[in-house]
Amino acid sequence: MNEGEVVLTPEQIQTLRGYASRGDTYGGWRYLANLGDRYADDAAAIVGKDANLNGLNLWMKKGVENLWDDTVGKKTRLEKFDRVALQHFRQYARLINQNNGRLPNTSEIERSYYKAVTDNGVSSSAAIDLVINRSLPDMADGYWALGLGIEAERIHNEQAVNNPNGSERDNRKQLISALDKGFDGSFKEKHFTFLQSVMMDVTKLGVEYTIDGWQKIGGWGNGIINDLYKSVVKREWTGIFEIVNNNIKQGNEAFKNEINSLVHDMKAAGKEFGDDLNTQWNNLTQAAEIIYNDIVDNTSQGIEKGVKAIKELSEKMKNAASDLADGSAEKAKQVVEDLAQAAKEAYENAKSTAEKAAQAAREFFKGLPSFKDLAEKFRDLFPNPEGWIDDGHQCLAPWVKETKKRNGKYHVYDPLALDLDGDGIETVATKGFAGSLFDHTNNGIRTATGWVSADDGLLVRDLNGNGIIDNGAELFGDNTKLADGSFAKHGYAALAELDSNGDNIINAADAAFQTLRVWQDLNQDGISQANELRTLEELGIQSLDLAYKDVNKNLGNGNTLAQQGSYTKTDGTTAKMGDLLLAADNLHSRFKDKVELTAEQAKAANLAGIGRLRDLREAAALSGDLANMLKAYSAAETKEAQLALLDNLIHKWAETDSNWGKKSPMRLSTDWTQTANEGIALTPSQVAQLKKNALVSLSDKAKAAIDAARDRIAVLDAYTGQDSNTLYYMSEEDALNIVKVTNDTYDHLAKNIYQNLLFQTRLQPYLNQISFKMENDTFTLDFSGLVQAFNHVKETNPQKAFVDLAEMLAYGELRSWYEGRRLMTDYVEEAKKAGKFEDYQKVLGQETVALLAKTSGTQADDILQNVGFGHNKNVSLYGNDGNDTLIGGAGNDYLEGGSGSDTYVFGEGFGQDTVYNYDYATGRKDIIRFTDGITADMLTFTREGNHLLIKAKDGSGQVTVQSYFQNDGSGAYRIDEIHFDNGKVLDVATVKELVQQSTDGSDRLYAYQSGNTLNGGLGDDYLYGADGDDLLNGDAGNDSIYSGNGNDTLDGGEGNDALYGYNGNDALNGGEGNDHLNGEDGNDTLIGGAGNDYLEGGSGSDTYVFGKGFGQDTVYNYDYATGRKDIIRFTDGITADMLTFTREGNHLLIKAKDGSGQVTVQYYFQNDGSGAYRIDEIHFDNGKVLDVATVKELVQQSTDGSDRLYAYQSGNTLNGGLGDDYLYGADGDDLLNGDAGNDSIYSGNGNDTLDGGEGNDALYGYNGNDALNGGEGNDHLNGEDGNDTLIGGAGNDYLEGGSGSDTYVFGKGFGQDAVYNYDYATGRKDIIRFTDGITADMLTFTREGNHLLIKAKDGSGQVTVQSYFQNDGSGAYRIDEIHFDNGKVLDVATVKELVQQSTDGSDRLYAYQSGNTLNGGLGDDYLYGADGDDLLNGDAGNDSIYSGNGNDTLNGGEGNDALYGYNGNDALNGGEGNDHLNGEDGNDTLIGGAGNDYLEGGSGSDTYVFGKGFGQDAVYNYDYATGRKDIIRFTDGITADMLTFTREGNHLLIKAKDGSGQVTVQSYFQNDGSGAYRIDEIHFDNGKVLDVATVKELVQQSTDGSDRLYAYQSGSTLNGGLGDDYLYGADGDDLLNGDAGNDSIYSGNGNDTLDGGEGNDALYGYNGNDALNGGEGNDHLNGEDGNDTLIGGAGNDYLEGGSGSDTYVFGEGFGQDTVYNYHVDKNSDTMHFKGFKAADVHFIRSGSDLVLSASEQDNVRISGFFYGENHRVDTFVFDDAAISNPDFAKYINAGNNLVQSMSVFGSNTAATGGNVDANIQSVQQPLLVTPSA
């Protein structure tokens, strides 16, 4: 925030918004003025509330009120003034809110006021508009701001934002600054202020005398003075004001200074201009001086004459007004005519002289903007050598911060300061080069420093007597050297040495007192001037007190007051003196001495000095190593070469640091020690933490990283002016972070140095090719030589040309060099085609590529076009300032021209592009230009919202001009002209006409503010009205029509249309179709027309019109306004007796009796017809009118049909009559009789009586104590709130009492009724009352679930009380008492006893929570336990018994019973029969008893008990809990040897050997018996116990029968023994022996061995590398997956290897075997013949099989061998040879010739004439290959 800047708080903003919303313009401005806004102070005066209005404010107010030239009459002008003022104030408040409380700047205020003026219909020649846009062109923001009283500070603040580097290139802001400071010595006083007063006088005449004086001489006089004012005073004043200011602007010496500044900067930057160019510069500057002098002379003369003429005119007008007041009409007329002539002559005289000056200025300065732009562009080709320091500061800041944090001290400076103005010692922050620089440490380098403010001073002593304070040694602080050679601890210690008499005071008694000075640095530059050094006597200082206190007070700005004392003045008063710790910024530094450079040295590349380093040129002049390295770097021709030298260059510059090599090596430490002269040390907590971590050691990796960074740390110290002797860390992570910050900072530094030297080194030869040329009488830069230079380099080194051009465009600010961008595009395309693009991009680096992928303009006139970088063809172009040309190219592009006259170019294939053209400036001319043969007839022009859409008719592209039609195309977003390739031009007016033309499709048509007729035509169209009175015709199609602010007519026509009226008194006609009409504001007329329409009138007095065939229409008439009168009007002869009036809910339904239509008036009856939705009157074609009261009576009349009748709030009797009726009560006490039919009756809030009558009725009591009588039929009664009486009557009724104490009444023949009595309230008493002689002994009481069933013993009826027993009868559903006709009463406790009594039938008995014994007796009973410990006896029958939460005992007794234990430790005994027992949770005991039982223990440690005759039982023992122990217990003398234990799958089978029973433990062996289904122990009656391990052993023992034996996961050996056995392997390596019998053996996942033994066996290998041996018999072997070995053994075997590399082994006597070797893998299979030589085996083809025959008895058939490789065996191995598949393949592939011949492999030739392979020739016996029989 700038000092003194006003910023509103959120609360103040809210208060301001309140003024805006109330329209209190004056109050709002005054509120802002009181907060310090000086613009608001003047604005408050201008809006006319302040009494003392004078001067400039009067001029502004009267000008705004009276100078409109398009309005007549004072009242109209004042109203318009008020509207302008209010809109401007509201926009001003909105800007403050958007700016987070900051006041708007001048540009924002200008735009706000301009918009307020134009939005309220004021033409561009209005007074304020003149001030902004005519009188002061190009300077409107500055002069206008001053004119309206904006303080100079805010103008300056805006300059600082717009020119952060202090650039003076914007001439408008130069003139503002010059004006504010008093341009031309006393410009404001001499010219501007004076001219304001003259203008005020003229205005005053036009106002006061027009109103007062001229009225006395009649209407003709008033007309003449108006004509005089408009034709002479106003127009001519405007002209001279414009000329004067234009000449002032063009004659401003700043133009000349700017030229000289540019030339100086260019030369200073090291650019060598030739003699010709220097001559041109000199000629131009000389011409400028000559013409400038002429301009000044002529302009001054013009100003003087103009001012004189205006003053004379003003005096004459005053005199004329006086004469006219009392003179005759004839005399008055003559005076006015003379006055007009005199004014004209005076003006012409002044104008002639002024125009001569203007013409001279225009002639010279016509070319100056382009020439100035030329110089700026050339200078912008290279960075400013000084400018890199700001970048360097940013990149080095992290290192400075890190060293401050790690080295235990902060660099501060420590001088004594005095408070000279009594407000405390004040300091300022470091400000880089813009602030104070001082040599504190006496090393010859001035560095940026915190400083004492100008109103306080530093205590100093000029030790060397040169009149200047040279360095910190001449201050009093820690750089003061004491007599003993040490440095002072602080300022007070330094001053104490001057206390020669030891009295602890420095005064005249001390010898050095007279040598002391106070330095008051008035200009804050850190350099002492003579007028800034004052003696103590001059300042009235008598003595300096050496006593002080340590305060360590934070002064802000990075500065601290460390010690504070005082000094005494000669008047006896005291003031503060303190020792400061000033912030240090060593980056911004300047050496006090300059190095004189030779001409050659001055040509070297340069960067400004930084830290402890001189300017690069100066440093190189002092260092031969650096000079040589800089020369080598400058001569390097490629980026790679420069980067290879960059590190060395950076180091060589760093080595010129005066401290280089003089300080001790940097070390890292966790042990901090306080030392003197260390500045501000670590905090105590940081010290404590360091001491805690003193033992932290670093890993070798961390140490290596730190060692590698040491050199870079030294470099960074030189560049930053830091000293990193010791860096502290608290952990290894801290240490590694130091390395990271070091490397990151160094890399950023290297990047900045590279970029800032680029144009002074490698790219300089290209810049030398840029020349100048004259075009249209002005200088421009000529880049043609530059293009040639790049192409020349490209011929020999394409990569260099590519990289150099890319970096020139990226860093040279040459985006306006169109040829260069086009050249880059060509280079990119060529690189892509050559496959080099990615390589080139890697050389460039990500940052450069990103800059080229982004396209953004400058303040100049740029040509912007994507050059092919980036991954997306869709680009965004930003023109910013200047007259820019934006070319998007292919892809979907975003183009934003910014300010200036911009041109958007679109050629063939332009894509889906968007143009954002916001530019509020006047005089700009923005153009869209279509090229490549595109003409207007190839495009369509449509509008969508405020956007203009230009679409190619062939669908190839679209340009969207955003907000084009804002302000009807006159706003800031417009495109002024659209140009086509055939020369045709469309202006805004033509475009506006085009977009209002309809098509046969779906159009969007918009009216303009003046009012239009729009016709949608065919298609589903959108029509939008504006502020005029529009006629909007939708025509055919489903149209959407939106009115504007006028009185519009909307006609939907055919189709289902939507019409919206908005403001104004609109007429809406839906036409045909189902339409939606909404009148919104105004007194509207809505005609739905044919179809089913929805009509909303909105606010205002609306009329809904319905004629014949109006359809099924709906009216929504919400309008809460008072005084409105809404009407429904029936036309076309429709009368009231042709309609019916009924009510449905709050809706009124008006139906045609002939069924032709209906009007539903929604919510008509809200508030009994007095609400916001009512229709006030219904009018008919015969003149009859129905008001609301009449309608209310009509809708309560019943018919013989199904009626809906509603009571009103006062209470009514409604009779439904015949039909199924709906009756609704209200707030009164209503009597609602349903009568005949199935009626629905709803009570209201009163005590109502509801009588259903005949039929199945529904009665709802709602609030109140209601009486509900269902009558005949099956009725539903709901009492809801209140103490209600419910009588179901005849039929099967459902009764709900609701809340309150309710009574249910049942008499004879009450039917099958249900009571739902939910009511949780305390204190209620609900009763069932039996009448008509019914007593308790005539009824039975039973329970079903939680329901109570009360049944008539004669079967005539039943009452079910739902959920009665919830919470054991104490819940919300209970009936508190049951009353009988004999006076007997049953309470809840009695009822609970009754329902637990059993019968001989099938009972449902329920225990209560306290615990019960229930006996089912005879019948199939259901017994239910509860939370107590229950005894539940099923007794006889098939019973279902359910335990509760207690420890319950369940006895099934006789029959097939189901027992469920639920929670608790339960005992379940099934008894006789086939029972199902489920213990569920708890440690349960389950006894199945006799019969075949199914037992589930559930969770917990359960025991299953089996005695004699236990039957065929099954145990399901799933329980995954840890710690449980489940047991099977055999009783009745049963021991283990009486049983067998076998396994079937995962089940354990325990069988009685005598066949009397079996227990199947399901899934016992899951996870090898460790799973959730296991039984932990089996107990026998003799005490023996079997654990799981024992059982597992038992089931693996074989018998002489057919066994099923299973291996375990760890690996097992299984022996089948006798019998046909099934053996199953598992995941381990198993040995499975089938032994005798026809066995089936299944391997598992391990490497298993399967031996079939005797018999015809089946062996299956599964996964793993298995060995299968069939043994004797005809066996089937299948290896499946893995590398298996298959041995068929004796017999005729079938062998399948499966996948993997399998081996088939055949020995002597192997029989007639078949091998099926199909596989899809690439493994190798082998057939091994043991005991056979190759000559013993014949190879025979048999169809597709290969037969290997050793004898008639022994042969192997390889099935499908000749089908292909997937069926073959790869290698045949014999005792003496091996034949591989490749050896054999050529003979297989030889085909029939080989098959039909005999080849002797041992001979040298064969029938085919070919030779055989050597390994096959080694076979001595012929191998026959013959066709099969």
UniProtKB/Swiss-Prot annotation:
GO cellular component: cell outer membrane; extracellular region
Domain topic, free-text comment: The Gly-rich region is probably involved in binding calcium, which is required for target cell-binding or cytolytic activity.
Similarity annotation: Belongs to the RTX prokaryotic toxin (TC 1.C.11) family.
Record membrane topology: Peripheral membrane protein
Originating organism: Neisseria meningitidis serogroup B (strain ATCC BAA-335 / MC58)
Disordered as annotated region, ranges: 1671-1690
InterPro entries assigned: Haemolys_ca-bd, Hemolysin-typ_Ca-bd_CS, Hemolysn_Ca-bd, RTX_toxin/Mannuronan_C5-epim, RTX_toxin_determinant-A, Serralysin-like_metalloprot_C
Protein name: Iron-regulated protein FrpC
Function, as annotated: May participate in the pathogenesis of meningococcal disease.
Hemolysin-type calcium-binding repeat positions: 869-886, 887-904, 1015-1032, 1033-1050, 1051-1068, 1069-1086, 1087-1104, 1215-1232, 1233-1250, 1251-1268, 1269-1286, 1287-1304, 1415-1432, 1433-1450, 1451-1468, 1469-1486, 1487-1504, 1615-1632, 1633-1650, 1651-1668, 1669-1686, 1687-1704
